[in-house]
Each structure stands twice: as C-alpha cells, then as structure tokens.
C-alpha cells in the first residue's frame, strides 16, 4: 500500500505552524506574472523543501511560455522543491501550453507536477487534482472515473472544507457559500437535525425559510474530511492537498500531528469550530 503524501498549501508567514507535521509544505508564494515570468511573494521568509504553488490569476496570456517554464524548473532546483502545484482557474490556451511543457520538463527531471482537473488533458505524466467538494453523485464514483481516465496512480485529492446553503429546488447545483462563523451561527439559531451522506462524505440538514422556502445545507467537519481521505485511499489515491486553514483544527484526526501534539477535542458533529 502506498504511503500517503499530504501537501499543505500555506503562506510563508505561517510555515512554523506545521513544523513537525507528517506533511510537506506547498508554498503559496508564486504566481505567473507578465512576460510571463515567475514572481515570488513572501518577503524574507526562507523557502526550502516541499513544493511550490503557482497562481495563474492575473496572467494576461501574452508572451512565450518557454522561458517561464525554465524559471520554474530553476526555482525548484535552487529551493530543493520536489515539484509544483499549478493553481489555475481559467483554461487559457497559454496556460494549457505551459502545463504541457512543465509536464515534460518535470518528468525528465524526476519532479512532481500537480494540475487542476480541467488541465488533465494537457499532461501525460502529472497528477490530476480532483476536488473533494461535491453537491451530488458519489465521491467514490468520481475517483473511480478519474482513475479510469488518467490512471489510478495519477489522481490526487484536494481536501476542501466547504459549507453551502442550497435553495430547493437547485437546478444549477450551486449554493451560497457559508463561512464557518456563518454556519455555526445558523446552526445555533436553527438547532437542526444533522445527517451524514455516505456518498458525498459530508453532513447536511434542511430547514424552511418563510420567504425563500426549503433549504438544504451541506457542510464538512473534521470527521467528514477523514471520511474523504479513507474513501480516496480505498480508491488507490495516496496524494492529498490539504490547505492549512481547512485542516488546522483536524490535523490530529488526519494523522498529521506527532503524538505529543495530538489533542482530542469534541466530536465535530457536536460542534462546528469557530474561526474564519
């Protein structure tokens, strides 16, 4: 059985918070800038080891991507990074070309590349990132379909702690995102009966609003995050992206903390953690 790899997307200023964890930092410090060229944020915090996260927001699509790809490879070499995560939310042709070039360059050098699912068709060696947040269907089925499409050893799961309020019926399948504070406030006011969906690996409840009618609220907690990890493991997935802000209060539950740091708090079904 493959050993799990947890990549923790985290800003440079918070790196000390995951010291001692059984995980690798994914440095939220890079973006595609004009040129395109590789731009780095994070000030004077030294970055070493783990992987780099490259944000594609703000890139205008202009310029040849070859020099940029060489800059990424060079940065990995200088910083001792084992790879890179492409955090692209738009399918611009230059970004697709960039992903394809990095896929080949990284494979030649034994580096790991992780790309969002919409960019999966651009790569043949890299791992493809699926989101754990679903509003319908089955997480297990989604992982199986991805394994058939990309290969079982090329699928990674992004653990996204989500909470959404859906008006019923919901023809688009999209709800209103809730912060943890908003979710807790709503649950404190409604005191709803909370249920668990095995297919989605998420908790949910329903309520009626005098003005807007029936609502369905789907949300995650530490226990559902662990459930998603276990479902993914059974599907042969061993690489997880777990953003620090989403898992910081359930890192022990996920097995990321050394025993000396583990503290068992109340079950997440009984209380939604505060914080934003």
Q: Model-flagged regions — what are they?
A:
Residues 2-138:
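Chitinase-like catalytic core of GlcNAc-active glycosidases
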Residues 62-72, 95-104, 135-145, 177-183, ...:
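Well-ordered, non-membrane alpha-helical segments in soluble/globular domains
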Residues 76-81, 105-111, 146-154, 228-239:
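A structural motif corresponding to the C-terminal end of an alpha-helix
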Residues 85-87, 112-117, 154-160, 240-243:
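A structural signal for short, well-ordered beta-strand segments and their strand-loop junctions
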Residues 91, 120, 162-164, 247:
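Residue-level marker for beta-strand->alpha-helix junctions and adjacent short loops that shape enzyme
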Residues 96-100, 104, 111-113, 123, ...:
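Active-site region of glycoside hydrolase catalytic domains
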Residues 154-156, 160-228, 260-261, 265-272:
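Glycan-binding loop/region signatures in secreted carbohydrate-active enzymes
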Residues 228-276:
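Acidic/aromatic/glycine-rich contiguous surface patches that form carbohydrate-binding/processing clefts
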């Amino acid at each position: 059985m493959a050993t799990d790899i947890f990549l923790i997307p985290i800003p440079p200023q918070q790196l000390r918070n995951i010291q001692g964890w059984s995980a690798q930092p994914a440095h939220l410090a890079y973006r595609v800038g004009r040129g395109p060229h590789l731009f780095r944020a994070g000030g004077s915090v030294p970055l070493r080891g783990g992987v780099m996260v490259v944000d594609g927001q703000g890139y205008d699509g202009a310029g040849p991507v070859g020099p940029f790809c060489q800059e990424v490879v060079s940065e990995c070499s200088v910083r001792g990074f084992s790879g890179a995560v492409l955090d692209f939310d738009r399918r611009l042709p230059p970004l697709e070309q960039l992903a394809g070039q990095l896929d080949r360059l990284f494979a030649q050098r034994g580096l790991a590349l992780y790309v969002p699912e919409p960019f999966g068709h651009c790569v043949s060696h890299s791992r493809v990132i699926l989101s754990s947040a679903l509003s319908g269907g089955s997480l297990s089925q989604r992982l199986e379909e991805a394994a058939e499409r990309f290969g079982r050893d090329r699928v990674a799961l992004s653990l996204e702690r989500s909470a959404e309020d859906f008006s019923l019926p919901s023809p688009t399948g999209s709800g209103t995102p809730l912060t943890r504070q908003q979710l807790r406030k709503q649950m404190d006011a409604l005191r709803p009966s909370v249920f668990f969906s095995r297919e989605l690996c998420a908790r949910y409840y329903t309520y009626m609003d005098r003005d807007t009618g029936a609502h369905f609220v789907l949300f995650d907690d530490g226990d559902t995050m662990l459930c998603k990890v276990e479902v993914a493991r059974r599907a042969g997935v061993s690489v997880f992206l777990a953003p620090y802000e989403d898992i910081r209060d359930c890192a022990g539950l996920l097995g990321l903390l050394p025993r000396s740091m583990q503290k068992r708090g109340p079950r997440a079904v009984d209380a939604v953690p505060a914080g934003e």
